[in-house]
Structures are given as structure tokens and as C-alpha cells.
């Protein structure tokens, strides 16, 4: 699902809201999450999950084509950890196909 499909679904489930308003709300929520992460804050949505930033140290990489060693700078990457309720719902709705019956 892409963002426009999410906006459309929310608008369909909430006919009292205009689709443009839903789009503005979704954009505002996503922008606030990004801004909080950029400030170094953790964003927790109870039952859904938590967004945070992980810091990866600089390291020595390798070009797979040439084999040459390449320095890789340190960087910050977004990280999402699912909440307990989400994990339980996903596992309840989609049991492990490899598990014995």
C-alpha cells in the first residue's frame, strides 16, 4: 500500500472528512515523525510501534566488483520496532506457514 491508497482508505472509512483533509493530516503526522527523529527523539505509538534513530559507525567496506576497499562514513538510520499488539495481531491473523499443524 502506498500513501495515496492509505489516504483513500481512511477517507472511505470516514465519509465526513474530505480526502484532501485526510491527506493533509497524514502528511502532518509523517512530517512530525521525521522532525522528531531528526531532533534525536524517539516516537512511540502505543500498540503500533516505536520509531528511533540508530547510529552506524564508520567502517571499511569493499567494492564487490573490483574488490577495492572503500571507507564508509558513519551514518544515522531510521529504525522501527513493532509494538506488542501489532506483533500479536499479525501472528494471530497470519500463523507461521512452517509450523506443524
From Swiss-Prot:
GO biological process, alphabetically ordered: DNA recombination; regulation of DNA-templated transcription; regulation of translation
GO molecular function: DNA binding; structural constituent of chromatin
InterPro entries: Hist_DNA-bd, Histone-like_DNA-bd_CS, IHF-like_DNA-bd_dom_sf, IHF_beta
Entry keyword DNA-binding: yes
Region (Disordered): 57-101
Composition bias, Basic and acidic residues: 82-101
Keywords tagged on the record: DNA recombination, DNA-binding, Transcription, Transcription regulation, Translation regulation
Family as reported in the entry's similarity comment: Belongs to the bacterial histone-like protein family.
Role of this protein: This protein is one of the two subunits of integration host factor, a specific DNA-binding protein that functions in genetic recombination as well as in transcriptional and translational control.
UniProt protein name: Integration host factor subunit beta
Organism: Bradyrhizobium diazoefficiens (strain JCM 10833 / BCRC 13528 / IAM 13628 / NBRC 14792 / USDA 110)
Organism classification: Bacteria, Pseudomonadati, Pseudomonadota, Alphaproteobacteria, Hyphomicrobiales
Name of the gene: ihfB
